[in-house]
Amino acid sequence: MNVFRILGDLSHLLAMILLLGKIWRSKCCKGISGKSQILFALVFTTRYLDLFTNFISIYNTVMKVVFLLCAYVTVYMIYGKFRKTFDSENDTFRLEFLLVPVIGLSFLENYSFTLLEILWTFSIYLESVAILPQLFMISKTGEAETITTHYLFFLGLYRALYLANWIRRYQTENFYDQIAVVSGVVQTIFYCDFFYLYVTKVLKGKKLSLPMPI
């Protein structure tokens, strides 16, 4: 395991903690896409089905459990504890537009036609587009709270660090995972416009608006 993988995991964890902290402190989930959070929970669920059958390391197991817990606690806060503050009128992205093609692609492009492998592949493809409902929500409302933009920044940073991790693994181990790399590149592309706005606006104390034609 190299430093890029560890930093990527920490960035991902920080993003989730920031989001949970924001919801808990404000007792409000306005501006947060519940649909994106459902997709992320689905990503972790289908990816970590091997949690009790395939032990790699304590670090790996702990991170899987933490990500699953954070994902489902976030969904619970949005649709349960603080559901009265949920902005359902603006969280209108049609999930079937993502789920149907991702399911189809998972059956067509995978490494092995087994249940666990197809579900793992599904999780990789789905993660690459799971943020779209959140970006769509921002483009629809015209702006995002600062803490939400920090959450998105660290999610994007996690993806960028994982790309560096794959490059490093290819150099040192001659390891190349085409499905993960291509999906990671696609996901990073979705964040590129956001990164520019984050640096030019948010870091200068301005509110972020994200025009995004869908």
Swiss-Prot record:
Region described as Interaction with the K-D-E-L motif on target proteins: spans on this chain: 47-48, 159-169
Site-annotated residues for Interaction with the K-D-E-L motif on target proteins: R5, E117
A single GO BP: protein retention in ER lumen
The species this protein was found in: Homo sapiens
Segments traversing the membrane: 5-24, 33-52, 59-79, 93-110, 117-135, 150-168, 179-199
Pfam families (UniProt xref): ER_lumen_recept
Principal subcellular localisation of the protein: endoplasmic reticulum
Written domain comment of the UniProt record: Binds the C-terminal sequence motif K-D-E-L in a hydrophilic cavity between the transmembrane domains. This triggers a conformation change that exposes a Lys-rich patch on the cytosolic surface of the protein. This patch mediates recycling from the Golgi to the endoplasmic reticulum, probably via COPI vesicles.
Gene for this chain: KDELR3
Primary role: Receptor for the C-terminal sequence motif K-D-E-L that is present on endoplasmic reticulum resident proteins and that mediates their recycling from the Golgi back to the endoplasmic reticulum.
Localization, UniProt: Endoplasmic reticulum membrane; Golgi apparatus membrane; Cytoplasmic vesicle, COPI-coated vesicle membrane
Residues flagged as site, Important for recycling of cargo proteins with the sequence motif K-D-E-L from the Golgi to the endoplasmic reticulum: D193
PANTHER family according to UniProt: ER LUMEN PROTEIN RETAINING RECEPTOR (PTHR10585)
Protein name as catalogued: ER lumen protein-retaining receptor 3
Region entry Important for recycling of cargo proteins with the sequence motif K-D-E-L from the Golgi to the endoplasmic reticulum, spans: 204-207
Keywords for this protein: Cytoplasmic vesicle, Endoplasmic reticulum, ER-Golgi transport, Golgi apparatus, Membrane, Protein transport, Receptor, Transmembrane, Transmembrane helix, Transport
